[in-house]
C-alpha cells in the first residue's frame, strides 16, 4: 500500500510537471508568435497607424485604438462572432478574453462611430487615384435578425470585391422603401467621388427597372443591369419582342443599340442578350456602355459575382467569418461590425499581395499554372496564420514585401489598385 501511494504521488508529480512545461511552452510560443506578427507589421500599433491613414476623421484616440484592437482580433480569429473577436484580441495583447469581449461590445454600441460619416475618408482611401470604377450593388440578408444589408462594393482584379459603402436596415421595412434605400447608397458614393470619375454599376435582376436607369443617367453613371426575359424590347426599326425572343439560335452575345424597353418604351443606349452554354439561364442586360462590344459587356457583368464571393467570406460559417451565425439586434451595430470586417479585409488583401510579390504564392498552388488560383484575401488569411511558425528566411521575404506594399501606398498610392 505504501509503495502504491508512493507511485501515485510520483505519477501525480510528473503530471503536474508536464502540465507546467506544456503551459510554459504555450506561453513561449504565443510570445514568439506576437513578435513575428509585430516584425511583419501586424501589431496593434501598426494597425492603429493604418486606421489613422484610412479614416482621417475626428475620432477620439481611444476609439481609434479600440477599432485597431478589434481589427486585430478579427485578423487573428478570422471570425465576426463578438466573443471570438474578443478572444483573438486577448491573445494578440496577452490580455483577458472577458475584458476584451466587453471592449468589442462597447465599441459596437458606440454611437460616435458612424460608418456613414466615415465613408468619406474610407472611399477616398480605397479608390485612390482611379479615374474609372467598376462597382457592384447588391442586397444580402440576415433572416434570423430581420436584417438586410445593401452593399456597394468596388470590383477589383484580385478575386474579391472591396467594400465601399453599405447600409443595414430592417428587412420588414423594405416594402415600399427599397428603391429609396438604394438611391441613398448610390448618391452617397456619388457625392464622395470626384466629378471626373467614371463609374459603371453592375447589378442583377432585382435592380432592373426604368427608374433606376434614369436615376443613374442623371448622376452621369454608366450601368450594366440584368433584367427579366419577359420585358419588351423595341429595336431601332420599331420591332417589339420580349427580350428572350431576341436571342440568337446559337446563344452568342448580341447587342441591340438605341433601343426602348418595357411597354413605356424607355430609351436606353443598348441591350445585350446572351445564353452561353455554361449559363443556366440567358442574360438580358440593359447598358449605357454602347461603346463596348457585346462580349465586353458580358465579361464586365460576369465580374459582378465577385461581390457574392465577398459576401461568402464575411457570412459563411465554414468558409468565412461566420457573420450569418452571429445574432445582432441593432442595425447600427451590424454596420460597425462590417466596418471592422472591411479593415481586416483590406489588411489581409495587402498581405496576400505581399506574398505574391515575394513569390510565395507558388507555395500555395497545387498545380503549375501561371495565373492566380487563390484570391489575395485568401492568400493573406493563410499567411497571417503561418507567420508565427514561419522560417526566418521566408519571414524576412514576406516582411520586406509587406513593407514595400505599405510604403507604396503611403508614397505613391499605386497599391490602391490592389485593394
What would you call each of these model-derived segments?
Residues 77-87:
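Short, charged amphipathic recognition helices of the HTH superfamily
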Residues 2-79, 119-120, 131-133, 157-419:
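Single, function-defining residue in the core of a domain
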Residues 96, 111, 115, 143, ...:
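Amphipathic alpha-helical interaction segments
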Residues 94-95, 143-146, 211:
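Short active-site-adjacent helix-start/loop capping segments
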Residues 71, 100-159, 163-165, 170:
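Active-site-proximal, Lys/Arg-enriched surface segment
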